[in-house]
Amino acid sequence: MAEFTVPEVDYTRYSNYQLVVIPLIILAVALLIIASWYVLTGSPVTQGIAFTGGTEITVETDGATTTQIVEAFSVEPESVQAVPTANTYIVTFQSNGNSGVAVTDLTRQAEQAGFEVQSAYEVSPSFGATTQTLALGGVGVAFLGMSVLVFLMFRVFVPSIAVVVSAFSDIAISVALMNVLGIELSLGTVAALLMIIGYSVDSDILLNNHVLRRSGDFYESTYRAMRTGVTMTLTSIIAMSVMAAVATAFGIQLLAAIGTVLVFGLIADLMNTYLLNLSLLRWYKFKGVAR
C-alpha cells in the first residue's frame, strides 16, 4: 500500500531573505496584473453577468460556426463559449451591450436561426449591482473578521500580521490568475475565494500554534505542523484538480472555475505558509523576541 510522507525541509540552509523574496516577488506581480486590469477595464477582475447584469443562453446547433451564431442575434454577444457536448454553445450578452433586448427576443432569434435553446436566463443590472455589493462585502467582512480573530488569538503583532499577509497574498494571486486564465468573477468564484481564506488561515494558524505554543525547538515544531498542513492542502489540491477536470470534460463551467481557482489558491497557500509566514515567524522567534 502506497504511503505519503512529507519530506523534512532543512530550513537552516536558507536565510529569511531567501525564503521571503520569492513570495513577495510573486505577490508584486499579482498586484501589478490586478492594477493593470483595473486601468484597462475599470475593474480589478472581469465580472460575470451575475454582477454586471445580462443574459446567458445555451444553444445546441446543427454544426453552426461561431460567426453564424453571432450573426443570428440582433445584438453582438459578449462571448460565445463552446461546451464539450457536441455542437453546444453558451452565448453571453452583457447588459451594457444588450440595448434593451429581452431574453424572450434573444430566445426567439436563436430559434429562428434553427438553434435549439436548452436554457436561458436574465439578470437585471440593478440586481447584479446589489449582488456584487453583497458578495464583495461578504469577502471583505470575512477577511476583516479573520484578521481580528488572529490578533485576538496570538496577541503579538508579527505572528498575527504574518497570517494576514499570507491570506491576502493567496487572494491576490488567485484573482490575478483569474484574469490571466479568463475566469470571470461570479458567485461561485467568490465562494472559492472565501474557501481560500479559510484554507489559508487554517494552515497558517496551525503553523503559528505549533511554533509559538507547543514544546520543541523551532524546526521540530515546523515539521510537525508541515506534516499535517501539507498533507491536508495536497489532498485538497488533488480533490479540486479532479473536480475541475471532470467538470471541464462535462462542460460544467461553474464547477470548473471553482476548482481551478481553488487549485491555484491552495498552491499559493503552500508557498505563502511555508516560505513567507515561516520566515516572519523565524525572524520573530530568533530576533524579534530578543529585542
Curated annotation (Swiss-Prot):
GO cellular component: plasma membrane
Pfam families for the chain: SecD_SecF_C (PF02355)
RNA-binding is among the record's keywords: no
Keywords (A to Z) from UniProt: Cell membrane, Membrane, Protein transport, Translocation, Transmembrane, Transmembrane helix, Transport
Source domain of life: Archaea
Family: Belongs to the SecD/SecF family. SecF subfamily.
Cited NCBIfam families: PRK08578.1-3, SecF_Halo
Entry protein name: Protein-export membrane protein SecF
UniProt organism field: Haloquadratum walsbyi (strain DSM 16790 / HBSQ001)
Gene encoding the protein: secF
